[in-house]
Swiss-Prot record:
Protein's name in the database: Aldehyde dehydrogenase 1A1
Species in which this protein is naturally found: Homo sapiens
Catalysed reaction, written as an equation: an aldehyde + NAD(+) + H2O = a carboxylate + NADH + 2 H(+); all-trans-retinal + NAD(+) + H2O = all-trans-retinoate + NADH + 2 H(+); 9-cis-retinal + NAD(+) + H2O = 9-cis-retinoate + NADH + 2 H(+); 11-cis-retinal + NAD(+) + H2O = 11-cis-retinoate + NADH + 2 H(+)
Annotated family: Belongs to the aldehyde dehydrogenase family.
Phosphothreonine modifications at: T337
Gene: ALDH1A1
Length: 501
């Protein structure tokens, strides 16, 4: 343990064996109904890691049936004490902590994530989040309401039922825990579809769910593709709620499918084009570093990426100079290799999209300060790229890039920069850097974003609600607000002979 309380980084596993590649339903492993499998790759080497059973509509139907059975009135799960649900979640957190090294290695190998980030950040976050959710299990409660007349009225916060949960590829394990933690704490059952690029850690966690003692059918995990397995979840008539993290484009399809089927509840955590506003009085070293990590963390593959940096005119040139200097320090390579500080993009589709947007920036007149192209002969690597002299109408200033590409814009007045920052379809997050508390509060109140960070960026914790305004999504995850998304409120009114205050 280091002096800061952060665990030391252990040597990663070099002989990782992938044990779980099947569909997990009713605490058992199943082959796909169709007999199909799909390949899973290492994005740093482009090598195939394994073949995973490919779930589709028939497999989702099986999983939903199991989840519905587990949710029946009188089932072991429905009659379990809330505190016991919490104990199972605490147990799952302990098992993930036990397998932390294996899961971090797997996340790095399958997702291109730096091993140090996977172990120190992602796994730590998963364990803390599960324990936070476990603590809430017996604290979700209704209230009594003094209505007029001789009646006794109270509310119950009941689990919604069977919840479909569709997980993204950029934070496979973190997002799995963000989804199942609150859902299970509230007493729901779940059908999970991990991203087809990164299903391996979810399937390992499935084995831990069984080991922890969750009843059969409470958690079901169906790997597969979005247009088949994901679509089956979104449109399923016996799923009561769907939660999705991913692109705005797919989020629209999911909400449409939910509406056309059974009007299932929907929470969406979608894309962003988050502004980061740096005022002239800001601590420049701090602002440069947070803004840098805000866009380059995990190769830029973050929904909250600070991908529009607005810098006040008087400090613009110096901010650009320091940002370029910082971006040039990366060591690219296999994220499992010690010393490497930037890994690959997830797949060729994302890699090609990023390079296309970089080319658009060059053509539209932005100044390329560094990077600007691919790196290496193997794997989906993109050079860390910084553009200055970016204007608001350029594609790189409007479209979500999801890559290691920083756009730095200039502003003169607060009114101007607030309007420009809000001039987007997105509204996930934002950053403000200033030593003036009045300006910090004024700007943060004016920004249309679900989270605003002041003199920092990307600080996410289980205790805080997370979600977007506008086309960055609906609903909130985590914090007390996140649990409301997994309950229905029922009002019960009882006629009594005499009411007494």
């Amino acid at each position: 343990m280091s002096s800061s309380g952060t665990p030391d980084l252990p040597v990663l596993l070099t002989d990782l064996k992938i044990q779980y590649t099947k569909i997990f339903i009713n605490n058992e492993w199943h082959d796909s109904v169709s007999g199909k499998k799909f390949p899973v790759f290492n994005p740093a080497t482009e090598e195939e890691l394994c073949q995973v059973e490919e779930g589709d509509k028939e497999d989702v139907d099986k999983a939903v049936k199991a989840a519905r059975q587990a949710f029946q009135i009188g089932s072991p799960w429905r009659t379990m004490d809330a505190s016991e649900r919490g104990r199972l979640l605490y147990k799952l957190a302990d098992l993930i902590e036990r397998d932390r090294l294996l899961l971090a290695t797997m996340e790095s190998m399958n997702g291109g994530k730096l091993y140090s980030n996977a172990y120190l950040n992602d796994l730590a976050g998963c364990i803390k989040t599960l324990r936070y959710c476990a603590g809430w299990a017996d604290k979700i409660q209704g209230r009594t309401i003094p209505i007029d007349g001789n009646f006794f009225t109270y509310t119950r916060h009941e689990p919604i039922g069977v919840c479909g949960q569709i997980i993204p590829w950029n934070f496979p394990l973190v997002m799995l825990i963000w989804k199942i933690g609150p859902a299970l704490s509230c007493g729901n059952t779940v059908v999970v579809k991990p991203a087809e690029q990164t299903p391996l850690t979810a399937l390992h966690v499935a084995s831990l769910i069984k080991e922890a003692g969750f009843p059969p059918g409470v958690v079901n995990i169906v790997p597969g593709y979005g247009p088949t397995a994901g679509a089956a979840i979104s449109s399923h008539m016996d799923i009561d709620k769907v939660a999705f993290t991913g692109s705005t484009e797919v989020g629209k399809l999911i909400k449409e499918a939910a509406g056309k089927s059974n009007l299932k509840r929907v929470t969406l955590e979608l894309g962003g084009k988050s502004p980061c506003i740096v005022l002239a009085d800001a601590d420049l070293d701090n602002a440069v570093e947070f803004a840098h990590h805000g866009v380059f963390y995990h190769q830029g593959q973050c929904c909250i990426a600070a991908s529009r940096i607005f810098v006040e005119e008087s400090i613009y040139d110096e901010f650009v100079r320091r940002s370029v200097e910082r971006a040039k320090k990366y060591i690219l390579g296999n994220p499992l290799t010690p010393g490497v500080t930037q890994g690959p993009q997830i797949d060729k589709e994302q890699y090609d999209k990023i390079l296309d947007l970089i080319e658009s920036g060059k053509k539209e007149g932005a100044k390329l300060e560094c990077g600007g192209g691919p790196w290496g002969n193997k794997g989906y690597f993109v050079q860390p790229t910084v553009f200055s002299n970016v204007t608001d109408e350029m594609r790189i200033a409007k479209e979500e890039i999801f890559g290691p590409v920083q756009q730095i814009m200039k502003f003169k007045s607060l009114d101007d920069v607030i309007k420009r920052a809000n001039n987007t379809f997105y509204g996930l997050s934002a950053g403000v850097f200033t030593k003036d508390i009045d300006k910090a509060i004024t700007i943060s109140s004016a920004l249309q974003a679900g989270t605003v960070w002041v003199n920092c960026y990307g600080v996410v914790s289980a205790q805080c609600p997370f979600g977007g305004f506008k086309m960055s999504g609906n609903g909130r995850e985590l914090g007390e607000y996140g649990f409301h998304e997994y309950t229905e409120v029922k009002t019960v009114t009882v006629k009594i002979s005499q009411k007494n205050s």
